[in-house]
UniProtKB/Swiss-Prot annotation:
Gene3D superfamilies: 2.60.120.20. Keywords: DNA-binding, Host cell membrane, Host cytoplasm, Host membrane, Host nucleus, Host-virus interaction, Membrane, Transport, Viral movement protein. A motif (Nuclear localization signal) lies at residues 81-96. This is Nuclear shuttle protein. Binds to single-stranded and double-stranded viral DNA. Interacts with the host nuclear shuttle interacting (NSI) protein. This interaction may allow NSP to recruit NSI monomers to the viral genome and thus regulate nuclear export of viral genome by NSP.
Length: 256
C-alpha cells in the first residue's frame, strides 16, 4: 500500500524538514519577480502615514530658460517625493489642488540692428507661457518632452488662440495661458509674469499617480509620473534680433 503521507488532508504525521523542498520553494518565490516585492516594500514604508495638504516650491531659471527670437522651450513641474521630509507625499498618488506662478521676463536686443534713420528699431513681439496637463505622461521616441510645434501645430500660433492639435486632444489639455505683448525702443526691458489656476474643485478632483517601481525611484520627475503631469511651455516670437530669459517660481498646492 502507498503511504498516505503525501496525500493532502489524510495524513496526521508531522511533516519532516526536507532541504530540497524548502530550497525549491525559495527559488520559486524569487522567480515570481522582485518588482512586486519592491512595490510592496514601498507601500509598507508609508501606509501608516496620514495624507496632508502641502505646498511644493520650484524655481525655473538659468541658461536652459533663455530663448532666441522665434523659439520655444518645454519643461515640467516637479511633484513631491515619497519621503519623510516635507514637502513630501505619503502615497503613490496625490490630489492636485492649485498651481501659482510668479516671476520676471527679460527681453534683450542681440547685435546692432539699425533702421533707415540710423536708429535701433523697436523690439516687438509676443511672449507666451502655457500650462498643459498631460493625462498619460511618456517621453517621445527621442527621449524628450513633446515640443511646442508638435503640441500646438506651429510657434506662430502663439500669436492667436492656442489649441492642442486634434490628434493629441485626448492626451493633453490646456490649463492656463499667459501672454505678454511687447513693444520697446530700448535695448532691454523687464516684465512681471504672474498667474494661477485651479486643478481640483468641489465637482472635480484631479489626481496624479506615480510608478514608484522601487524605493530609489520614488521621486516627482516626469518619467516617474503615470497620470496627470503638468508641462510648461515658454515661447518668444519676434522679428527683431533678440532673446528672452525668465525666472519663474511655481507653487503647487496638493494633498498627499
Amino acid at each position: 500500500m502507498y503511504s498516505t503521507r503525501f496525500r493532502r488532508g489524510l495524513s496526521y504525521v508531522p511533516r519532516r524538514y526536507n532541504p530540497r523542498n524548502y530550497g525549491f520553494k525559495r527559488t520559486f518565490v524569487v522567480k515570481r519577480g522582485d518588482a512586486k516585492r519592491r512595490q510592496t516594500q514601498v507601500k509598507k514604508l508609508t501606509e501608516d502615514v496620514k495624507m496632508s495638504s502641502q505646498r511644493i516650491h520650484e524655481n525655473q531659471y538659468g541658461p536652459e530658460f533663455v530663448m532666441a527670437h522665434n523659439t520655444a522651450i518645454s519643461t515640467f513641474i516637479n511633484y513631491p517625493q515619497l519621503c519623510k521630509t516635507q514637502p513630501n507625499r505619503s502615497r503613490s498618488y496625490i490630489k492636485l489642488k492649485s498651481l501659482h506662478f510668479k516671476g520676471t521676463l527679460k527681453i534683450e536686443r542681440v547685435g546692432s540692428e539699425v533702421n533707415m534713420a540710423g536708429l535701433n528699431p523697436k523690439i516687438e513681439g509676443v511672449f507666451t507661457v502655457v500650462l498643459v496637463v498631460d493625462r498619460k505622461p511618456h517621453l517621445n521616441p527621442t527621449g524628450n518632452l513633446l515640443q511646442f510645434d508638435e503640441l500646438f501645430g506651429a510657434r506662430i500660433h502663439s500669436l492667436g488662440n492656442l489649441a492642442v492639435t486634434p490628434a493629441l486632444k485626448e492626451r493633453f489639455y490646456i490649463l492656463h495661458v499667459l501672454k505678454r505683448v511687447i513693444s520697446v525702443e530700448k535695448d532691454s526691458m523687464m516684465l512681471d509674469l504672474e498667474g494661477s489656476t485651479c486643478l481640483s474643485s468641489r465637482r472635480y478632483n484631479c489626481w496624479s499617480t506615480f510608478k514608484d517601481l522601487d524605493p530609489s525611484s520614488c521621486n516627482g520627475v516626469y518619467d516617474n509620473i503615470s497620470k496627470n503631469a503638468i508641462l510648461v511651455y515658454y515661447c518668444w516670437m519676434s522679428d527683431a534680433m533678440s532673446k528672452a530669459s525668465t525666472f519663474v517660481s511655481f507653487d503647487l498646492d496638493y494633498f498627499g
